[in-house]
Structure formats: structure tokens, C-alpha cells
Amino acid sequence: WKDSGMPLVVIVHGLSGCSSSQYVVGLQKALELRGWASVAMNCRGATGEANDLPRAYHAGAHDDLAQVMTLVAERYAGVPLSLVGYSLGGAMTLNYLATMPLPAHLFAATAVSVPLDLASCADRLDQGLSQIYRKHLLDNLMKAWQRKVLKLHSLGLEADAERIEHLLALGPFNSFRAFDDAVVAPLHGFHSAEDYYARCSPLQNLARIHCPTMIIQAADDPFLTPKCFPEASTLSSSLYLDVSPQGGHVGFVAAGEHWREPTYFLEQRIPQFLDSQVPESVRRAEMVKRLPPAYQSSLA
């Protein structure tokens, strides 16, 4: 990061992702080409190192995101900020935008491949080819919680470790709803999976978002249901819904000049939208920066 006055983008990965995920790194490279800086948030346990508490990240964990945004806003005071979230990170992003105090310099956000209605999306993963994704994600989640159990034991936090062991033993889990009901809900203060879905689905909060925000969805996303493509009347005037006929889940791959070098629609669309929302003062600073030094002092 160089204090150039250019925007800084905070990026939140999806379920089973991390700051090293291809879609995160790809966006960071695209932003760097524009002279923008970026920060990638790693949610609890995302790097493979379990955190010290009997909790993880979920659609309603926007308190963690709020802490990161506050830290970034304080560390880079006055710098224009924007926010991008993918999949579950997109759900966290939208819930954060709707329910939390926002930094004064946050000017725009984007959420991609978002399960806006958690209940129907959980059931969607029990159908057809989507079950392949469900098995992969549930296997990763079980491994993450098992690592957490070992970490808690190593710290002498036996009560927490044993509680999680007891919940995991209720498996095997053959659906997200069963896993969320047995593990996620009780460990994060929800009465049940239904309670978690009802309280943390971003769909109910969209009308409360006032920061300019684009939601990018693909019509062929195997994770999403019709409820994830809301009518314009349910959106606030600050929300924009961009639906692509193809793109899958966080994929959005387009043919490149060579078949081994595909291009990614999101690496073009996200910076394009964020750039369209940049404050005029930042645009002026960027223009001045591109001028020869002799002209910069007179125009800055």
C-alpha cells in the first residue's frame, strides 16, 4: 500500500475459501493494474489454522467484518474504501451494509454469487448435481471443526472442545440443513437451522442498504434459487442487480485469446462498477497523478 489517495478495496472470501483463493487473488491483480490497493480478509479458521474460540464464520458473522472494516478505516484514515464479498462472504457483506455503522469513506460495495435466502439455498444443495458441491463443502467444514477441537484441547479448553466433539458426533451429516441445525446454530446462538436462516438471510435486509452496492448473480448458479434473484421493487435505490445467464458459482469464466488463458468476467465487472462510484475528489487526484510533475502542483 502506498498513500496515493487511490481507493482501497476490502475483499471477503466465500465458504471454504481464503485470501489465497483464485478469485480473490485475481481481483487483487485486476485492482492493482488500476492503481488501487486491496486487503483480503481471512475469516475465522479459513487459513487452516483454527482460532481459539468455539465459533466460526457464517452468514451472520458481520460483527467480524465490522471489526476489520473499522481497523482498516482507522489505519488508512481518509482513504476511500470499498468492499467486495463472495458467496457466504457476500452474505456477510450485505448483512454488514444493512445493519452496522459504516466507515465515513466507504463509497461502494459488490456482492457476488450470494445465497440471499439461506433456507432455500441449503435445500437446493440437496438436489441433482448440486449434491457434489454439498459433499465437498461439508467434508471441508467437518475437517475445519475437527482441527478446532484439537486446537482447543491443546489450549486446555476442554469444555469447549468436548462440546464441539459432542455436536460433531451427531453426524454423519448428509445435508447443510442437518449440519447447520446440529453444529452451526447451537455454537453461534441460534435456536435451530431455521432460526439461523431466518435471522441471517440477506434478502430481508436489502431495502436497508444505502451504500451503492451491486449484486452479481449467475442464472445457472447451482447454489442459488429463484429467491436469490429479487424483483427490483424489493431493492433499495442504492442496489443494482446484475444477472448473467452463465457464470456458475463465483466462476464467470469467459474465453480468452488462448484456451489455456481464460478471462474472468468478475475481474472486469467489479472494478468497472466500483470505478463508476468513485468520489469526484478521488477522480481528480487520479487525473493529477497522471500529469507531468510540472502541472501537478497547479492542479492538485
What are these regions (language model features)?
Residues 44-82:
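Catalytic nucleophile-loop/oxyanion-hole region of alpha/beta-hydrolase
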Residues 209, 215-217:
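Short beta-strand/loop motif that positions the catalytic acidic residue
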Residues 6-14:
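Short beta-strand element of the alpha/beta-hydrolase
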Residues 247, 251-300:
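Catalytic active-site module of serine/aspartate enzymes centered on a nucleophile-bearing elbow/loop
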Residues 17-20, 28-52:
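Conserved alpha/beta-hydrolase
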Residues 76-187:
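Alpha/beta-hydrolase-fold enzymes
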Residues 235-252:
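Catalytic histidine neighborhood in serine/cysteine hydrolases
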Residues 1-5:
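Short beta-strand-to-loop junctions in surface cap/lid or active-site-entrance loops
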